[in-house]
């Protein structure tokens, strides 16, 4: 398995937008499935924002698009939110864990941040396992706090400090 992580480029955005139109990919995300053009415009705006504290990367296996991962700036000093979405064709192969390892290294070594936070719905067992395997600690659970398509989900909040 040869994964590469590259900073987001404009030509990557259609692949991300296609992935985020998939119902299965977005099932446990707090957004989506998205309209292709809305997603494309959202990522283009992020790419063009030179003052952004967000770091977005595409994930590829050889030349195949696997997904995207990011560290998103937060209001808390020296703290980033970890995010990753993988195309469902690549689930269950350990790529989410590898994306997390990459982001943790980038956050602590390159950005010199002190803390990374993350969250997921409690039903998103894959993401929960990834966070735990990466060393994140569960710090809080909010019950039935997010309504997605009429279903109330519990949200798990995680933290990892250097």
Task: Walk through the language-model features, giving the residues of each.
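Hydrophobic alpha-helical membrane context
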Residues: 34-36, 49, 156
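Residue-level signature of transmembrane alpha-helix interfaces in integral membrane proteins
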Residues: 38-43, 51, 110, 149-151
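A short, aromatic/hydrophobic, helix- or strand-capping loop or linear motif
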Residues: 28-33, 53-59
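Conserved GNAT-fold acetyl-CoA-binding loop/helix
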Residues: 24-45
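Phosphate/oxyanion-binding loops and surfaces in catalytic or ligand/nucleic-acid-binding neighborhoods
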Residues: 22-23, 49
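Acyl-donor (CoA/ACP) binding surface of acyl/acetyltransferases
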Residues: 1-22, 59-162
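A short helix-loop-beta-strand connector motif used in the catalytic cores of GNAT acetyltransferases and
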Residues: 44-58, 67
């Amino acid at each position: 398995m040869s994964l590469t992580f590259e900073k987001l480029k404009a030509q990557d955005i259609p692949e991300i937008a296609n992935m985020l139109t998939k119902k299965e990919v977005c099932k446990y995300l707090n957004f989506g499935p998205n309209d292709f053009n809305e997603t494309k415009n959202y990522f283009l705006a992020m790419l063009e924002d030179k003052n952004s504290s967000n770091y977005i990367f595409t994930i590829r296996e050889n030349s195949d698009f696997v997904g995207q991962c990011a560290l998103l700036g937060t209001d808390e000093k020296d703290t980033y939110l970890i995010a990753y979405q993988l195309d469902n064709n690549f689930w269950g192969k350990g790529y989410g864990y590898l994306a997390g390892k990459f982001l943790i290294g980038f956050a602590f070594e390159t950005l010199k941040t002190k803390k990374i936070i993350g969250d997921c719905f409690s039903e998103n067992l894959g993401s929960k396992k990834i966070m735990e395997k990466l060393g994140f600690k569960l710090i809080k659970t909010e019950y039935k706090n997010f309504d997605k398509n009429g279903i109330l989900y519990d949200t798990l909040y995680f933290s990892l400090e250097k």
